[in-house]
């Protein structure tokens, strides 16, 4: 029995590379292969330098490889729509870091347990990971009628993939505020801030609620921040929640861990950290199943 589950990453951009470095610390996952479509890509060269198999043939290079059980897709929403059915036919678990949203929205602090058997999960967006759990926490106590989030990220942290996905980004984030957050209506706005030095990712979450129970709301928000901090240490409340009648304003800042990407790229850090937190649990489950099979075979 292997001690780790083999995985592949499609898309060697900012997110794909940050994922690779985070997964290199995982106790349960071994990144076997990194694939892209540009032979001279810096990401593929970096993956090779770290001993990973690489290919510029895209998804073709991993289809049919039975050893690879989990595939992280860090390409674009349009590309994932093509990849999803191919990965499913090949029996691979897809963790989608694009806003394609083929599978259910996955926000580990809220949905982890119920999704461990899913064959395709969507990591929403960086803003979705940062804001949906807060809306969920407020909704449990106060019934959120409307949620609007403004995610401000450094222009420098937005690579070509993020920029191509802006429309899908706002749409997917708004839907997650409703589906996972529980808001009756959700809206998302993203702002790319060109300031130098680059700013930290900041998320302002406005909610209107039916039952404004201030102490209950503050407690629920603080508890949720604690849960997220376990897998995103740089996640924090910028100021305490501001409660004005039925309006609640929560401001969250996300500082990246600064291992591969700079600390201001908290927007990328939160989605890769969430993907790894979820993937580790899936891999743990697969390893336990492998072990049980071996015990039965030798029993």
From Swiss-Prot:
The gene is mhpF. InterPro entries: Acetaldehyde_dehydrogenase, Acetylaldehyde_DH_C, NAD(P)-bd_dom_sf, Semialdehyde_DH_NAD-bd. It comes from Carboxydothermus hydrogenoformans (strain ATCC BAA-161 / DSM 6008 / Z-2901). Belongs to the acetaldehyde dehydrogenase family. NCBIfam families: ac_ald_DH_ac, PRK08300.1. Pfam families: AcetDehyd-dimer (PF09290), Semialdhyde_dh (PF01118). This is Acetaldehyde dehydrogenase. Keywords: Aromatic hydrocarbons catabolism, NAD, Oxidoreductase. NAD(+) binds at residues 157-165, 267. It comes from the Bacteria.
